[in-house]
Amino acid sequence: MTITRKSHPLMKMINHAFIDLPAPSNISSWWNFGSLLGLCLMIQIASGLFLAMHYTSDTLTAFSSVAHICRDVNYGWLIRYIHANGASLFFVCLYLHIGRGIYYGSYMYKETWNIGIILLFLTMATAFMGYVLPWGQMSFWGATVITNLLSAIPYVGTNLVEWIWGGFSVDKATLTRFFAFHFILPFIIAAMAMVHLLFLHETGSNNPLGIPSNSDKIPFHPYYTTKDLLGIFILLAFFLTFVLFFPDLLGDPDNYSPANPLNTPPHIKPEWYFLFAYAILRSIPNKLGGVIALVLSILILALFPLLHTANQRSMMFRPISQILFWTLVSDLMILTWIGGQPVEPPFIVIGQVASILYFSIILILMPVAGLIENKLIKW
């Protein structure tokens, strides 16, 4: 008689995905971030659901409903801060996951990689709309500035912006629809994550060496279930410490003032996880050019499989590519810093140089480094 987990239609799927899945024996802790992202998504959906029970998506009551959650709802302050900082945790894991993919050449699984890029766009859209919901000053002005970027699209731009707003400015209609989309998108993200896994399990995981590991596989359970659990506990310990001791560290003080269309904050900026893209947007004086650069800064990830010139998949034994990779990481940190600074010298020039370097490393230097390393191997 077959074991239930191998014969039952539903259990069989779970078994193939999480129990009897053949996994490479040498994948490091960098491969933990997939499961950690799943955990982040579950935390966000659960905390968001409880927040939605008390939140009202009306311009007159949105701000006070958030205050009500923090003051009057049992542990409402905790749920609110878990949700707000959970978004930051989500993006930390997301960026580390993407960085791992770039370093070890995981982008060569094109379908998995492209679904991942779609997931990134969906997550960014969800986070942006969620930031608008508390209806504070930065919520309102962030929504106004970012949606206004679409007006740079020739011919249809203005109509498109007014269509998204549901009027001639960011108002009640905008807030209501943003709440509706913010609620539904995480479930779409969850569905896309399943597709992401489906494509991954077609090929199997990559590994640090970037070579086929079919000759040396181990079952996912108990080895990697235990390893994932360790990662989950470490992450939760760090996360809860952060939420309970520094809940407002990453937030903007302006968002504790109710939205006022008549008073513009001195520095309008998004949350920290969008600052690198915001810096690239601001580094181009032309509005349409800036918007194109902003979209390309993320969409450029789709070019990685096409720009891979090296004979080796992973960067583990490619020193020149390693230097370029860590330069890219440093460059992104500089862009993140610049995105939070006012538009004045010397920040303007630093932002422009960092933006040029960002695109140069990915489009020119990395492919050239791959070709040089191919030659070095033959010497």
From Swiss-Prot:
Gene3D superfamilies: Cytochrome Bc1 Complex, Chain C
Binding annotation for a ubiquinone: 201
Domain of life of the organism encoding this protein: Eukaryota
Chain residues that bind heme b b562: 83, 182
Membrane topology: Multi-pass membrane protein
Any single Pfam family the record assigns to this protein: Cytochrome_B
Keywords: Electron transport, Heme, Iron, Membrane, Metal-binding, Mitochondrion, Mitochondrion inner membrane, Respiratory chain, Transmembrane, Transmembrane helix, Transport, Ubiquinone
Cofactor list: heme b
KW Cell cycle (keyword) present: no
Free-text cofactor note: Binds 2 heme b groups non-covalently.
Transmembrane parts of this sequence: 33-53, 77-98, 113-133, 178-198, 226-246, 288-308, 320-340, 347-367
Signal peptide annotation: none
GO cellular component, one term: mitochondrial inner membrane
Chief place where the protein resides: mitochondrion
Compartments, record wording: Mitochondrion inner membrane
Residues annotated for heme b b566 binding in this entry: 97, 196
Additional note from the record: Heme 1 (or BL or b562) is low-potential and absorbs at about 562 nm, and heme 2 (or BH or b566) is high-potential and absorbs at about 566 nm.
Function comment: Component of the ubiquinol-cytochrome c reductase complex (complex III or cytochrome b-c1 complex) that is part of the mitochondrial respiratory chain. The b-c1 complex mediates electron transfer from ubiquinol to cytochrome c. Contributes to the generation of a proton gradient across the mitochondrial membrane that is then used for ATP synthesis.
Subunit comment: The cytochrome bc1 complex contains 11 subunits: 3 respiratory subunits (MT-CYB, CYC1 and UQCRFS1), 2 core proteins (UQCRC1 and UQCRC2) and 6 low-molecular weight proteins (UQCRH/QCR6, UQCRB/QCR7, UQCRQ/QCR8, UQCR10/QCR9, UQCR11/QCR10 and a cleavage product of UQCRFS1). This cytochrome bc1 complex then forms a dimer.
Family: Belongs to the cytochrome b family.
PANTHER family noted in UniProt: CYTOCHROME B (PTHR19271:SF16)
Protein name: Cytochrome b
Organism of provenance: Chaetodipus baileyi
Gene that this sequence comes from: MT-CYB
